[in-house]
A protein has these predicted regions:
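Positively charged n-region of N-terminal signal peptides that target proteins for export
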Residues: 1-5
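Bacterial N-terminal signal peptides
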Residues: 9-20
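Electrostatic cytochrome c docking/interface patches
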Residues: 24-49, 92
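Electron-transfer interface patches adjacent to heme c in soluble/periplasmic c-type cytochromes
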Residues: 40-41, 67-82, 89-102, 120, ...
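The canonical Cys-X-X-Cys-His
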Residues: 46, 50-60, 104, 108
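Short, non-ligating residues that shape and space the ligands of small metal-coordination modules
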Residues: 63-64
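Flexible coil segments in periplasmic/lumen-exposed cytochrome c-class electron-transfer proteins
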Residues: 96-142
């Protein structure tokens, strides 16, 4: 066997081994709304915004109904943020500050059972693209 064949075979074996190890290694942990992506204070401010601006068209509970959860579960959080920030409030779309939209979104997440965390929800579409909406099914009240 020539040295070239031996080295080529060893290289192929090494590449296959490395590919197998890389495939088995855990990747970066996915960030979801179940990871605590907003603060309790941020959600409280979002509730104030919701109750003063949004509730006239969207009664309390609108954003925690089964149809809402089914539509958004698994989607990037940036999609919901973009929808809110470009179309709401209905009479004056896109008139709130980005932080106000993020606060309102934090409130919506809280209402859907997502836990609060230590860092505020960012008001950036780019950052929110990294977060998936995870809304576990609500269990009916006894």
């Amino acid at each position: 066997m020539s040295i070239t064949r031996l080295l080529t075979g060893a290289g192929v074996l090494l590449a296959a081994t490395l590919a197998t190890v890389a495939a088995q290694a855990p990747g970066p942990k996915a960030v979801t709304t179940s990871s605590g992506v907003y603060t309790a204070a941020q959600a409280a401010r979002g509730e104030q915004t919701y109750m003063s601006i949004c509730v006239a068209c969207h009664p309390a509970g609108t954003y925690s109904a089964a149809a809402f959860r089914a539509k958004w579960n698994g989607q990037p959080l940036s999609d919901l943020f973009s929808l809110l920030s470009s179309t709401m409030p209905k009479q004056e779309p896109a008139t709130l500050e980005p932080e106000e939209y993020a606060q309102t979104l934090a409130y919506i997440l809280r209402e859907n059972g997502a836990p609060a965390g230590k860092e505020p929800l960012p008001a950036s579409v780019k950052a929110l693209k990294q977060i998936r909406i995870d809304m576990p099914a609500k269990t009916p009240a006894p």
